[in-house]
Design a protein with these regions (language model features):
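ABC ATPase NBD Q-loop/coupling interface
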Residues: 53-75
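Catalytic Walker B motif of ABC-type/P-loop ATPase nucleotide-binding domains
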Residues: 159-163
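The feature captures the beta-strand-to-loop junction immediately N-terminal to the Walker
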Residues: 29-31
Length: 221
């Protein structure tokens, strides 16, 4: 795929080609401004491509792929989700923030599972009382944990991670990595594309390594 900026002086992504495999972690590295975040936003359907295509395999048939251009945006975003580096939470409790996606048309057919959240919080060394905390009083790490749980509960097939552990303390970073890897391993159809500058925690868990430089993607399988 290719992505041109609104001004013609620079190409943001040039001829990027790759395949994300189910059940795997793909780590994407590169210097700031190399195009990593732009690539994630294109894959998530949040930025248009100048040319090229993105296809998603239909797990009900080995020979069927869904093209992004031919798929309704709501349908695409049900299956491909982006976890941003800087979480945005609404005013209200943690519980209200977790319930918010189910008010959207794309997820009205899904059911909020509070027991799942209580179980996840237990793994994160937090009690169920955490659900009643005011979101505006959370630390940066706690906000990222809430933002992550809010996405994971929706069970996308492809999860795009834009430096999710940046600026987190060591303990919270470890908890977040463990949470994401556990979620991945719970369903063989899931895959992670993980953008990071700090590879020491995630690289040992990675199946593949992609690198981006000046908008050019290279893959090391």
């Amino acid at each position: 795929l290719d992505k041109e900026p609104s001004t013609p002086d620079r190409t943001l992504i040039s001829g990027a080609s790759g395949m994300l495999l189910s059940g795997q972690v793909t780590v994407l590295t590169g210097a700031s401004g190399s195009g990593k975040s732009v690539l994630l936003r294109v894959l998530a359907g949040l930025l248009p491509m100048s040319s090229g295509t993105v296809r998603l395999h239909d797990d009900t048939s080995s020979n069927v792929y869904h093209d992004m251009h031919e798929t309704a945006p709501i349908r695409w975003r049900q299956q491909v989700a982006l976890l941003a580096q800087h979480p945005q939470l609404l005013d209200g409790s943690v519980l209200e923030n977790l319930q918010m996606p189910y008010q959207l048309y794309a997820h009205q057919s899904q059911t909020f599972d509070i027991d799942w959240h209580v179980a996840q919080l237990e793994h994160l060394d937090r009690s169920a009382d955490f659900l009643q905390q005011d979101a505006k009083h959370l630390s940066g790490g706690e906000r990222q944990l809430v933002n992550t749980l809010r996405l994971l509960q929706l069970s996308p097939k492809v999860l795009l991670l834009d430096e999710p552990t940046a600026a987190l303390d060591i303990d919270t970073s470890t908890q977040l990595v463990n949470l994401l890897i556990s979620w991945l391993r719970a369903d063989a159809q899931r895959t992670l594309l993980w953008v990071t500058h700090d590879t020491k925690d995630i690289m040992p868990l990675a199946n593949r390594h992609w690198h981006m430089q000046a908008g050019v993607l290279t893959a090391d399988s």
